[in-house]
């Protein structure tokens, strides 16, 4: 009988602890303020109920469809929205007019901002997506990727390791990019063979990226500028003969031509 009482007390104490933990974990509530969004979904505004990293108690946030859309001290600012089976979790935040929906997951301190969209089954893990960028399909971003402007990632593509997509860069298919890849204007990458890069070859540029466009020709991203291959060749030819750029980049040009079978 004593053992039964001890067991009962332990269970009761465990239940009380679980309820307390849940109460401590809860940091927002759904308000009665509702909207019907552009997708025809009825969403409810959230309100912060205790101070944490992104909001203070009583502060209103954005709109979500259900409590399961948000967790782990993640937050949605006033104009941002989450719906469907999508989840924004683990200290991530939506700002501006960002939208996350479908079965997408945004986690581990990611920031989705401006007019950015993450949807379908996409995963954004510890990354920054802004501008009018889109991440969709079954694609995923991880480990500090930055997307901006009108960049898109979709299909089964994966990008990681502080890579950066700018302007109208597009990555799709089964492309798998890492090692701080930088893609910019007119990039159209559907497989790994569509791009390559060179690191720390001269003081002017930490990264020189070469990639295909949708038309099939090449662009070179170097020192924050984008060149056609012809223009980049001229840049090398005009360089000071004493510069590291002049000494190193003719060899880089030869590698580019061999790599892309020119």
Annotated model-derived regions:
Residues 6-10, 14, 103, 121, ...:
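General helical structural elements
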Residues 8, 19-21, 32, 106, ...:
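N-terminal compositionally biased, intrinsically disordered segments and leader/signal-like regions
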Residues 182, 186-189, 193-206:
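Low-complexity, polybasic segments enriched for Lys interleaved with small residues
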Residues 9-12, 26, 161-162, 173, ...:
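Terminal low-complexity, poorly structured segments
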Residues 1-23:
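Short, Lys/Arg-enriched N-terminal segments with co-localized hydrophobic residues
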Residues 68, 74, 80, 86, ...:
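Residues at the loop-to-beta-strand transition
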């Amino acid at each position: 009988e004593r053992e039964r009482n001890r067991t009962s007390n332990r269970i009761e104490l465990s239940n009380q602890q679980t309820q307390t933990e849940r109460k401590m974990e809860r940091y927002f509530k759904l308000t009665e303020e509702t909207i019907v969004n552009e997708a025809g979904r009825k969403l409810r505004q959230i309100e912060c109920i205790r101070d944490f990293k992104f909001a203070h108690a009583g502060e209103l946030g954005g709109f979500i469809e259900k409590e399961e859309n948000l967790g782990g001290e993640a937050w949605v600012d006033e104009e941002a929205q989450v719906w469907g089976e999508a989840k924004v979790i683990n200290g991530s935040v939506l700002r501006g007019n960002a939208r996350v929906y479908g079965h997408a997951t945004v986690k581990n301190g990611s920031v989705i901002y401006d007019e950015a969209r993450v949807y379908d089954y996409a995963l954004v893990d510890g990354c920054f997506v802004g501008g009018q960028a889109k991440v969709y399909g079954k694609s995923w971003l991880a480990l500090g990727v930055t997307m901006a402007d009108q960049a898109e990632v979709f299909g089964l593509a994966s990008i990681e390791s502080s890579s950066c997509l700018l302007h109208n860069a597009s990555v799709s298919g089964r492309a798998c990019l890492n090692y701080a890849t930088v893609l910019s204007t007119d990039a159209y990458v559907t497989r790994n063979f569509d791009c390559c890069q060179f690191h720390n070859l001269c003081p002017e540029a930490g990264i020189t990226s070469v990639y295909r466009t949708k038309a099939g020709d090449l662009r070179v991203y170097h020192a924050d500028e984008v060149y056609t291959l012809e223009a980049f060749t001229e840049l090398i030819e005009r360089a000071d003969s004493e510069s590291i750029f002049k000494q190193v980049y003719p060899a880089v040009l030869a590698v580019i031509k061999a790599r892309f079978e020119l």
